[in-house]
């Protein structure tokens, strides 16, 4: 079961420039900054109502974000849904025939656990599932 849209992830080349632009858009700076070594990204989170906008910058050339930008340029990378139990959600989606990207259950931002559903499974949209501790 999906609890809510947790955030929308946007891939950027330069985090400082993107932060400046989103600060202008939101009228204030980011609510959270973090480097997530396991995902090879630096992130900035802007709270927007009950959801958030996550800016993601690659920290390594083999990062999924670096590969995304090389192939598609900057822009929307994924939509993330909060789930109460990641294993149950993944089991349900696998049973439904959806392709889970390897590395499911890995460490995400703020101590969360995350998994990604391949965009081939959901008409061109990468979906992230997040479970908070």
Language model segments and positions:
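Short, charged/polar surface micro-motifs in flexible loops or helix N-caps
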Residues: 49-53, 60-62, 86
């Amino acid at each position: 079961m999906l609890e809510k849209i947790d955030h929308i992830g946007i891939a950027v080349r330069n985090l400082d420039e993107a932060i400046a632009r989103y600060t202008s858009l939101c009228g204030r700076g980011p609510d959270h900054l973090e480097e997530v070594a396991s995902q090879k990204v630096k992130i900035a989170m802007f709270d927007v109502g009950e959801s958030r906008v996550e800016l993601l910058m690659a920290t390594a050339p083999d990062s999924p974000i670096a590969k995304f930008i090389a192939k598609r340029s900057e822009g929307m990378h994924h939509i993330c849904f909060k789930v109460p139990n990641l294993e149950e959600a993944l089991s349900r989606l696998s049973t439904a025939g959806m392709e889970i990207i390897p590395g499911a259950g890995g460490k995400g931002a703020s101590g969360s656990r995350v998994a990604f559903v391949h965009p081939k499974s959901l008409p061109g949209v990468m979906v992230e599932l997040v479970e908070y501790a």
